[in-house]
Amino acid sequence: MRVRPRDRDGGPVAVWAEDLIEVAETSASSPVFPLLKRPDERYVTMQEHDHPVFVEDMVRAAAVALSRDDRMIWFSVEAVNDESIHNHAAFARIDSAQLPLRGQDAPAVLRTAEVSGV
């Protein structure tokens, strides 16, 4: 995820890394855990199974969240899933330049925006 935030006057403004991490994590199948014990692995695996999120879905959800943040004048979201079952990786990317101007219906455009899946 790359962003270019600006304040209301067009000047640079800081965005906390934790805010961007939250956008990424809430766009995924489940939260990220740095360490899991065996009993917790089943819970996390089942949660991911019950709420599958493909890379295309993840970048769309993150783009919706970022497009609602008035500080963002530009952003790009990429997601890669290294497949464990298939012999390929899934990739998706969306750029705010693909979206309508602020004030238009961004979520509707995100449903039809071109997202690469390989």
Question: Where would I find each of the regions flagged by the language model?
Answer:
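N-terminal intrinsically disordered, cationic/polar leader segments
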Residues: 1-118
